[in-house]
């Protein structure tokens, strides 16, 4: 009885609040075997196909590549992309990608050569001989991201779960209508699914491994049971069909009874989840050394004559796949990537298949129902009952329309999984998920702006602090420089301190002079005489330097010639003055001999002439001095001064001897 109770507890499943039961519409594609899509004429590989930044390019246009060759560098959370086949890189240019915005992203354009040649491969037959970090690096370099739709880098997710993981859950629910990619993958490749689970179990060492699958996939359930025969370490749990039971938080609640707290991931409660398609990709990367270059894509809808699931290379244009399934264009044209609840209408059919593209839905004109206009909310509360995350969709709608961002955030807008259950049950046809997506984008933009502003403020404050530190350091250096002593000053101070220390210690005795005796000042007198001798020597050196400079000043030949001319003029004038004085004296003597009165007159005239001669001599001396100064300044000025002196001397001579 106890064993039966334990078994029932072991297989127990729980339920989550909310959820809906839309038409499944899976039989169109789940009953048809998978097909391999041929290579298209051109492959378009976007550089970013995961959550995180795009990788750095490793190739150039015009380069030949091989199948499986990496096109970008994978570092950190950057997942590399690989060449899906061998061929020529014709261009590296922007192209419209699978996104609701329809914006162009950088892509690598490859023209296949038809040979499909692989790069060198290194399979690992026994992965258990490899350490965990080598396995994680292998998974990362294979470019594996979550194939269930989130696109989170798988290696990063696994590395975060190396410690503390209690339960490993394999998500095989595939709850959204129309999509059957995982269903067919489990039916045809159940052995690879189980092998991939063993690799994850070797990495994470969880206490239990659970596979959650909805009860509307009997063929897949049977295939997994056959693959698990004889293995009791992996438990298959069949859960009731209910949308969105494939959500990470919802499936965790169903299988473990635990709820993931608001704002956190399932790893916070010891649970790690991986999609079935991701598990197969891990097996092929680790054991077969095959990077993620293809995936299973469901092509379904009434606009297709041959729906089914295809192995499609990453980068295959959507229109090419639709033609393989017998696409019949509708009016108005509408092709959805993803399911009818969580998918989005493609802006163009030239967009390529990426790693998270699990379904291409091409409905007929009447298949999705007539489009009805949006009406006002009637506050019926059906959206609250349908929400599997336990949110208040009606309140979030009002906050989103009113741009009340903080209120929307506080009401846990980011816990919305965008499943579309609220919009599905809304009688007013309000596209609630679109409002939530737009509000999330606006809040993220505001957060980024706030982060940039905070970074700018932090940089400004850091700069101000640095400038303040530099100013203080500068002032300190100036203070230190102001009080810093030279070596000589320091020696003097040290000597004085030493003398004071010796005196205080008594080591230096004071000299006492007895009364009636004179102190011996011979040393002081000798020092004074030495200083005087040094002063006299310096004075003699200065005089010698001045005489040398004067001698050097007369070295110029032109200056010497001018000086000689001035000397001759002075000598000539002196001779003339002497001759005039002699004549006057003789005339006076003759006049005295003849008449005393005439003698007096002659004497007066002689005195006047002598006075004029003295004035002429004084002028000549001034002119000579001026000429000497001009000569010292400029040779040309000296010549002019000499000419002027000669003219003045001539006039003076004429004044003395008018006759």
From Swiss-Prot:
Domain 4Fe-4S ferredoxin-type: 366-397, 407-436
Cofactor(s) the record lists: [4Fe-4S] cluster
Binding-site list for [4Fe-4S] cluster 1: 377, 380, 383, 426
One Pfam family named in its UniProt record: RnfC_N
Residues that hold [4Fe-4S] cluster 2 according to the record: 387, 416, 419, 422
Class of this enzyme: translocase
Entry's cofactor comment: Binds 2 [4Fe-4S] clusters per subunit.
PROSITE patterns linked: 4FE4S_FER_1 (PS00198), 4FE4S_FER_2 (PS51379)
The organism's place on the tree of life at top rank: Bacteria
GO molecular function (one): 4 iron, 4 sulfur cluster binding
Entry keywords, A to Z: 4Fe-4S, Cell inner membrane, Cell membrane, Electron transport, Iron, Iron-sulfur, Membrane, Metal-binding, Repeat, Translocase, Transport
Enzyme Commission number(s) from the entry: 7.-.-.-
Major subcellular location class: membrane
InterPro entries membership: 4Fe4S_Fe-S-bd (IPR017896), 4Fe4S_Fe_S_CS (IPR017900), Ion_transpt_RnfC/RsxC (IPR010208), Nuo51_FMN-bd (IPR011538), Nuo51_FMN-bd_sf (IPR037225), RnfC_N (IPR026902), Soluble_ligand-bd (IPR019554)
Gene3D superfamilies in alphabetical order: 3.30.70.20, NADH-ubiquinone oxidoreductase 51kDa subunit
GO-annotated biological processes: electron transport chain
Topology within the bilayer: Peripheral membrane protein
GO annotation, cellular component aspect: plasma membrane
UniProt record similarity statement: Belongs to the 4Fe4S bacterial-type ferredoxin family. RnfC subfamily.
Function: Part of a membrane-bound complex that couples electron transfer with translocation of ions across the membrane.
UniProt subunit comment: The complex is composed of six subunits: RnfA, RnfB, RnfC, RnfD, RnfE and RnfG.
PANTHER family for the chain: ION-TRANSLOCATING OXIDOREDUCTASE COMPLEX SUBUNIT C
The protein's name: Ion-translocating oxidoreductase complex subunit C
Source organism per UniProt: Yersinia pseudotuberculosis serotype IB (strain PB1/+)
